[in-house]
Amino acid sequence: MGEQLSPDEKFQLITRNLQEVLGEERLKEILKERELKVYWGTATTGKPHVAYFVPMSKIADFLKAGCEVTILFADLHAYLDNMKAPWELLELRVKYYEQVIKAMLESIGVPLDKLKFVKGTDYQLSREYTLDVYRLSSMVTEHDAKKAGAEVVKQVEHPLLSGLLYPGLQALDEEYLKVDAQFGGVDQRKIFTLAEKYLPSLGYTKRSHLMNPMVPGLTGSKMSSSEEESKIDLLDKNQDVKKKLKKAFCEPGNVENNGVLSFVKHVLFPLHSEFVIKRDPKFGGDKVYTDFEEVEKDFAAEQIHPGDLKASVELALNKLLDPIRKKFESPELKKLTSSAYPEPSKNKGGVKGNPKQTTDDDEVIPSRLDIRVGKVISVEKHPDADSLYLEKIDVGEEQPRTVVSGLVAYITEEQLQDRLVVLLCNLKPQKMRGIESQAMVLCASIEGEPRKVEPLDPPEGSAAGDRVYVEGYESGKPDDELKPKKKVFEKLQVDLKISGEFVAQWKEQNLMTKLGRITCKTLKGGNIS
């Protein structure tokens, strides 16, 4: 996308509309040799709001300049920042952020195939990263850590140790994502300077830092995901947008800390080449502006009324939000939204930490399945059936379960012995040739001549009893026993597939454990049963 641009032109595009750049010369040197690698990270806390269009518009610039762009969903950071995201909701929040950020990018015409999306805990729990956290903690003073997080981490009277770790982890992300530059809001500046100071002490390269301005919230302060009154949510309905804008701080002639005016400057103008003030003909009629300075000048001179400014912003904003709202009308994304951000009242009568728990026994959702990692302790042929194996499988309970599987034609006893498998554990026990089977080994299969079958593979390092879940359905409580007449598994099984990347999925949502994805070795596109 940036092949026709010179290094200087790429630099201008990368740095336009930024408030500050640290390490400009490093950027210029890299651009003379190759494309720039940059990342933008977001802690998965409260719901993303309209100010997120500021970094989205810059990501569009980076791609136009030929940059390799990584978007980091910083789930661990969301927990470290005074537990703004509870541990049991982290996976759901990541999934929500991924869907809504992608919807935002699509709404402004950014191609998703040019972006790389990464979840923080995919690498931040590794041995190497953890060791670097300890190494860094032996160098960074409490003063420096507290100072670095002052404008990002929630400030409390007695700060938690987690908040002091936060800036150092963000610094390490630059190394582990293998980028040349980190992009973020100017409120991240102290974390960026901490990274520049300490990464070289670990033997790592100093990175450049790109900072966009912060958009004031509707109350005149920083727009914040965790402060409802300060921001407009991306899924707010038209009437909610109108109501919030009506309450917004916007004094006649006052251009300081004016969240509505700032939104025009930092969001609408970078995305569009013009902005239209809509007003009654008796007050001059509609007026088209092609640069922000003219809007600011007319507002300061009170030639633009706050009511007309708000009404015009409302119209432009709803055009941006409409495709995002439409995408989130799907049942799956509605369910994801309510699960990732449960209403406080919904938790009162249920089990703490289970926002998905429901009294509706007829709702067919994957959290009703009790799927676990199991380890095959012993395997032998069924005494009365040549096509069946009789296995003892440890699923993390006091005693191993007896399982009968029709796998003789597809896998040898030696291959099954001591193997980790994935089991459905809450089917009603069923006798197979006289022996009761207490679970089912889940396998991928492809029909044909010959039929191909492979047991699913848990992530490396898994242990017997590890829970397996579908992304977006982590918090539900499995049925004690699936009632055969309800055919819950049969209904869900229709949408259980192996993806093109050999990942087990339900309706394109990954089957996971706490350590990663459930996979199979070779049966791309296979069914799961």
From Swiss-Prot:
GO BP of this protein: DNA damage response; tyrosyl-tRNA aminoacylation
Q: Where would I look for the motif Nuclear localization signal in this sequence?
A: 242-247
Top-level EC class = ligase
Q: Which residues bind L-tyrosine?
A: Y39, Y166, Q170, D173, Q188
Positions of the tRNA-binding domain: 365-469
EC code(s) of this entry: 6.1.1.1
Motif 'HIGH' region boundaries: 44-52
Give the UniProt keywords, A-Z.
Aminoacyl-tRNA synthetase, ATP-binding, Cytoplasm, Ligase, Nucleotide-binding, Nucleus, Protein biosynthesis, RNA-binding, tRNA-binding
Q: The motif 'KMSKS' region: which residues? A: 222-226
Region span, Disordered: 335-362
Q: Where does it mainly reside?
A: cytoplasm
What the protein does comes down to: Catalyzes the attachment of tyrosine to tRNA(Tyr) in a two-step reaction: tyrosine is first activated by ATP to form Tyr-AMP and then transferred to the acceptor end of tRNA(Tyr).
Tell me how this protein assembles.
Answer: Homodimer.
Protein name per its UniProtKB record: Tyrosine--tRNA ligase, cytoplasmic
Q: What is the lineage of its organism?
A: Eukaryota, Metazoa, Chordata, Craniata, Vertebrata
Per the record, the gene is yars1
